Every structure is written in structure tokens, then in C-alpha cells.
Amino acid sequence: MRNKKIICLLAAGLGALLLTGCGGENQKTYEQANADLEQGNYDYALNEYQTCISAGYKLSQSYRGSGIVKLRTGDYQGAIDDLTSALNDEKTGKSDQKDILEYRAAAELKAELYDQAMADCQTLAEDYSLNANDYYLTGCVALAMDSYDEASSNFSEAYGSDSTYEMAIQIYEAYLGQDMEADGTRYLEAALKTEAKTADDYCERGKVYYYMDDYENARTELTTAADKGSTEATLILGMVYMAQGDTSNARSFYQQYIDADGDDPAKGYNGLALCDISDGDYDSALQNISQGLGDATSDEMRDLLFNEIVVYEKKLDLSTALSKAQEYGQTFKDDDAAAKELTFLQSRVGNQAAAGDASEADTSNESTAEESADTGTDESSEESY
């Protein structure tokens, strides 16, 4: 009898140890998924969240994380489905429900499901206290639905709640996307009335002037920011000079950014690649893209890989460009410019095959790839969520 008790106790202890071990592994996987999400390592994060979901671990949070990854990588319907699963989990608290509703509305906006997005925005307004990002999101949805007065009202609330340079730029970009630049410019002008005090302030002011194509004032503000220690200012100075076609000065500032920000040099390498493309030095562009990819987050990888397509097209290596564009489209499903580029390349490669001689392909219908080269400045509307 005593031996049986010992065996039972050992079995119970072993079972508890196994359960604890599984729980510990699931916790590590979940924590790593959160870290990968924050760092923009979306492929890893998605696999880790899916592992947690399969294990039934922290289902609400894991579905939420998976939904955010899919939102940021262009799988909008997948994001909506996962975020809905998170909302339907009985363990999801009220504050978490608000957060998930915000993300789902952003995914619905991106998926052009405007009625559903507005319904979620209305639920937020009815059940929760709104913050600046909520007003901004609602404004974006209203703008997409051509409800201009409602959009204006919500954008005014957003800027009133968060009168920062960043919010002004986001509202400007929302209007710019609807060919209503003048409506957005007034927010940039309002932001410039704020007195700069810190390096970040001067950097943001320089960014505003950059968006307004006022490059002289942009250089002044950004130079002050750089002198005060802003690394980002050197990157944007490179963009300012690049916009003016001064690749020599642009290179200098992009290199300064790389040297100063050793932990995240990818944007600087992307800038150098843009200079190379402009100068027609395509082999150097590929080298800089390769170096940038070695340290790139998923968002930075998007810019670099798009520009890689551009380079191969400029080299007239259309087969490689097509292959790269197909790979890109599988990863970044929401990029309209890349989708157009893919269609163009499919047509060109098909025509070459039909002609039977790639060297005689007509280049008169050259795509706008160079003009579309990704500077990495896009700030999509869901980034606040």
C-alpha cells in the first residue's frame, strides 16, 4: 500500500511537472511573439502566435497579436477574422475589447469594408471614451466614405486632443491620399506655430517642411535638430537633398545616419540605394540593398525589396525583376504600386518570350518604377494602432 502511494505521488508530481513545463514553453513562445511583433519580425511573430493559439494559450491575446501581424502585412481579412475571435473570447476584458475594436476597424478600413469599419467606430464612440487616435481613425473612415464634414470634425477632435507634429502629418497624409492636399496642409501650418524646444521638435518641424516641399526651411530645422543630437534628422536631411536631386549631399547624410545608428542602419542603406538608382549605378544599389536587408525589420524590408525590383528592371533583367515582384507580392499583399509593377513585368516578359529575342524588347513603354522607388516615408493609417 505504501509503495502504491509513493507511485501515485510520483505520477502526480510528474504530471504537474509536465503541465508546468508545457505552460512555461507556451509562455516563452508568447513573450517571444510579442517581442518579434514589436521589432517588426512579422513572420516569426505570426508563427509564434499561431503556436499559442493551437495550444489554447492566452487565446484572446494570441488572436489579437496574430490579427495585428496580419493587419501590418496586408492580410486584412485574416486580421479581421483573428481580431473577431479575440473579441468573442469570454476572457477578453472591456479595455482589451476597445483596443481590439480599434485594430479591427483599421483592418476593415484597409479592406475597404467601410460600413463595417464605421460600425466599429460608432461602437467605440458609444461604449468608450475616445482618444486622439480613435478620432483620427474615424476621420479616415469617414473620408473614405466621402463624408467630408464628418471627417473634418473627427480630424479636428484628433488634433485638438493631440496637437503634435506627428498627428498633423498623419492628417495631412490622409487628405493627400484623397487628393485633398489643401485640407491637410492647414494642419501642417498649425503645427508649425508650435515653438520648438527639443531636438525631436526641430526634427518634426523639418519633417513638416519636407512634406510641404519647403526644402530650405526643412534643412534649417533639420540641421538644428542634428546639431542637438537627432539621428533621425540626418536621415531626413538625406531625403531633402534627394528630393532636390542632390545625390552627393544625400549620400553624405545617409552615410552619417548609418554610422550614427549602428543598431538600425537599414533606412540609411535604402537611401544610398535610391541615390545609386538615380545615378544609374545599379550594381552598387544592389549591394546597398543587400546590406540593408541584413538588419531590416519587416517594414524596412518592404522598402528595400521593392527597390530591388526597380533595380533589376532598370538593369533590363526583367525575368529576375518579375521573380522578385512575385515573391514581394506574396509577402506584401496590400502594395498597389507593386501590383501594378507585377502586371507590367508579366506583360513585358510575356512579350519578350513571344518575340523570341529578349534583347530586342521595346523599351518605349518603360514603367514608372524609378519614380515609384520606395523612400520608406509612407506612414499608413493603421500604424497608430
Predicted regions and their residues:
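C-terminal motif of bacterial Sec signal peptides marking the signal peptidase cleavage site
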Residues: 18-21
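Register position in tetratricopeptide repeats
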Residues: 38, 72-73, 110, 144-145, ...
